[in-house]
């Protein structure tokens, strides 16, 4: 029962080993916020596991995922992703999830006009409590037929301009722009952390 100087030359079969090209030197915390049913969990699952399900259960409180994000410069960021429930009765608890967040994806459903209106609450809440948090407005469900869409790009752009946010239109169902959202926000997290280091 001693220590051996030899080490296995490769991991056991079936075991995945994720070796980053550069040492992981940064961690980031990202939170998804928005009304219930806008697709926050679907966005997170599409990004982390590349899956989509029409029958996701409603998130109660919050959920946690983690992803290693490969950046353009070859470095990596360990991103902790907090997926929150959108029910109004849980809003007081959600501060536990977004405390010390580096970034927030404030998400709305393009087929539900009220869901964009309600994003203003989250912007104001984060600016009040997490003033250095990077904010990204995410329009979800852009795969729907045009006649079902209640919020056009121009209206969303006006919202983004008013609050100085990053903006993406996405579809968790098709995967459109999902990776771009996380890659862009991760780059911004790294830039912010490097400026404060």
What are these regions (language model features)?
Residues 1-197:
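TRAFAC-class small GTPase G-domain
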């Amino acid at each position: 029962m001693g220590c051996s100087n030899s080490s296995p030359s490769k991991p056991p079969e079936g075991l995945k080993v994720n070796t980053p090209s550069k040492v992981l030197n940064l961690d980031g915390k990202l939170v998804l916020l928005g009304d219930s049913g806008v697709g926050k969990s679907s966005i997170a699952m599409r990004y982390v596991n590349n899956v989509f399900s029409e029958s996701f259960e409603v998130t109660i409180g919050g959920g946690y995922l983690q992803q290693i994000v490969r950046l353009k410069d070859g470095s990596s960021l360990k991103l902790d992703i907090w997926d929150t429930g959108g029910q109004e009765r849980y809003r007081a608890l959600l501060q536990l999830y977004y405390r010390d967040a580096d970034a927030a994806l404030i998400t709305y459903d393009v087929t539900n006009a009220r869901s964009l209106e309600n994003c203003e609450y989250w912007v104001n809440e984060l600016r009040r409590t997490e003033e250095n948090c990077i904010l990204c407005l995410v329009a979800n469900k852009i795969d729907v037929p045009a006649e079902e869409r209640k919020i056009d790009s121009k209206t969303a752009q006006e919202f983004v301009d008013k609050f100085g946010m990053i903006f993406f239109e996405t579809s968790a169902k098709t995967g459109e722009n999902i990776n771009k959202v996380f890659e862009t926000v991760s780059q911004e997290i790294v830039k912010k952390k490097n400026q404060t280091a």
